[in-house]
Amino acid sequence: MNLKPGVAWIIGGGSGIGAAVARELAGHGWQVAISGRRLDRLEEVSASHSGIHAYPLDITDAEAVAATVTAIAADFGRVDLLLYGAVAATGTPPGSYDAARFAAAFDVNVMGLVRLLDPVITQMSRQPTGGQIAVISSLAGYVGLPRGGAYAATKSALITLCQTMRVELEPKRIIVRLITPGFVKSELTARNRYRMPMLMETEDAAWRIVDGLVRSTRFEIAFPWPMVFVMKAARLLPYRLFFWLSALTLRAR
């Protein structure tokens, strides 16, 4: 399968992977709407290509979400691809489970997507060719590791939600895709104070995502493969061994 250029909407398109994917898609003839809270970031990205268009949005505002879906559909006639990449990355100190910190992470990372689903599904269901919903999770969502409680929990929630949606939305001609990258250079990863194996350039990650989206309909786009293998294998370990190895990572940081 080779997905023809159409209309894409990227949530979190003002920086990082979202911005890089917007440029990659626009370079291949797509019309790309990008959304995020910071208008200055969106305008900077949209100025880089005539096919990129800024739609400021607070993903925690359900009414604004519905209005933005309506606006994009009115401007372009359709939404062929939704890429959800909004992220609130919150580190959690070992043994600390602050409710406000967890709530903030879930409100953006998970509930932000949920607020989009009904209006986007309604729009895509009207389209003869349906559409695609792609969600950027993380390899961190495969297992729970120290200091990543809130972030990993949200990414794990996205993985299981996408698994559910893949089956439920197929009759509506909507293909759900899960994207699980490892460490990718961004403002968020720049804050990390620990070793990040196989840290990837943002543009490389964007190319892999776009290539996976347009060339196939497989469920998961995961990379880099050595990290994917390690993290998926970790899920198969006996808990006693897994917890012992997990404790080693806590001491090593």
Question: Language-model segments: which ranges?
Answer:
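Active-site helix of classical SDR
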Residues: L117, T154
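Conserved glycine-rich cofactor-binding loop
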Residues: G14-S15
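Active-site loop immediately N-terminal to the catalytic Tyr-X3-Lys motif
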Residues: G95, L145-G149
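Residue(s) in the substrate-gating loop at a strand-loop-helix junction
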Residues: S138
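Rossmann-fold cofactor-recognition segment
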Residues: S48-E63
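C-terminal helical subdomain
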Residues: L178, Y194-M231
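Substrate-binding pocket helix/loop in short-chain dehydrogenase/reductase
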Residues: P93-P94, D98-F106
